[in-house]
Amino acid sequence: MPLQYQSGFGNDWATEALPGALPAGRNSPQRCPYGLYAEQLSGTAFTAPRAENRRSWLYRIRPAAQHRPFEPFDGAARWLSDFGAAPVTPNQLRWSPLPLPDAPTDFIEGVQTWGGNGGPGEHGGVGIHLYAANRSMQGRYFYNADGELLIVPQQGRLRLATELGIIEVEPLEIAVIPRGVRLRVDLPDGQARGYMLENFGAALHLPELGPIGSNCLANARDFQTPVACYEDIEGDFELIAKFTGGFWRAAIGHSPLDVVAWHGTHAPYKYDLRHFNTIGSISFDHPDPSIFTVLTSPSDTPGTANMDFAIFPPRVLAMENTFRPPWFHRNVASEFMGLIHGVYDAKAEGFAPGGASLHNCMSGHGPDADTFEKATAADTSQAHYIRDTMAFMFETRRVIRPTAQALASAQLQSDYYECWQGLNKHFDPAQP
């Protein structure tokens, strides 16, 4: 049976897998229907402003506290939160796609950290990861106490069985798992690869639209949150926790995905990037890439995000007498890019689906020589249709510190800088 979802963003949801499982008129009755336990999951402080407050009430078969003591877990050794172990270079960096594993590897085992900043203790910054896996999580569940997860599949579907219901995402869709939500990751296609951002800061929001108006970019109605769905199974399972940068394991005698009903605002969701309503210039110039923002994590500085997630989807370029590709740039923010599908319009070669690039604070970047020559000779009286593409960017206010494993990776392209060396000198003071 097809999975069911609730439509909207930031709603106060209410859903039950059994009729009457949600208590009427109160959150914590003396006795819950069906003999369930009431439990609140708080994603923000109790006193956070109402518009920012994130919490959900769960009605579950057993409380989340019921498990054996945690002990250290070493099965996620490549998922890191220490971003100060390797020196930071101002060089532009690019990587080829991560290969799929040969040995059996589930999602938790297959995460590899490529860089980040801040950390769980700062309640700010991000971790940037790649993942490659070839088996579903077996007898294992996971939650992240350090931050929310933004998952960007590039190859293969993910079935995210969470406490609050089931989400299935495919390439060109994204999923967000809030801080603390327990889940199991299954691979319907047998293997999967993609990108993941770990947000240590404020929860992701839709960006303000300002003069754009009340519509466009990612519209709230296109986000989907799961309906209640529970597992009532007993056995020898393990619960993996990411806590203050480390990983911990606890034995648990039942599935923790046993929430029969829930209501609230702290919940996972998915979004189809193909629904993004792209905005662009219909006169001249290429606008700033902020017009492509899907989600943003605000910081304590107005107008400056902890992190932005932007995409570069299929679109029509109609600007006349304009250099249409993304322009040459140096940015106070740091930019990590990935390619989900197709070709990125600023790079003719070398940036493949599943690959990644990093342009840190004030490191010059922009179109390669081939792209520049073609764009400066193009007929801009005709519209240009970019159809076969889906690139994305994680942009952060802080420098992204690459990990030692990213810098030592066989996928690192040591010749990336060469893509700009072919840019010719055209300056002639006698020819305005």
Curated annotation (Swiss-Prot):
- Give the Gene Ontology MF terms in alphabetical order: homogentisate 1,2-dioxygenase activity; iron ion binding
The cofactors it requires, by name, are: Fe cation
Q: In which pathway does it act?
A: Amino-acid degradation; L-phenylalanine degradation; acetoacetate and fumarate from L-phenylalanine: step 4/6
Keyword vocabulary terms for this entry: Dioxygenase, Iron, Metal-binding, Oxidoreductase, Phenylalanine catabolism, Tyrosine catabolism
Q: Where is the active site?
A: 286
Q: Which residues bind Fe cation?
A: 329, 335, 365
Any one Gene Ontology BP term: tyrosine catabolic process
Q: Which reaction does it catalyse?
A: homogentisate + O2 = 4-maleylacetoacetate + H(+)
Q: Write down what this protein is called.
A: Homogentisate 1,2-dioxygenase
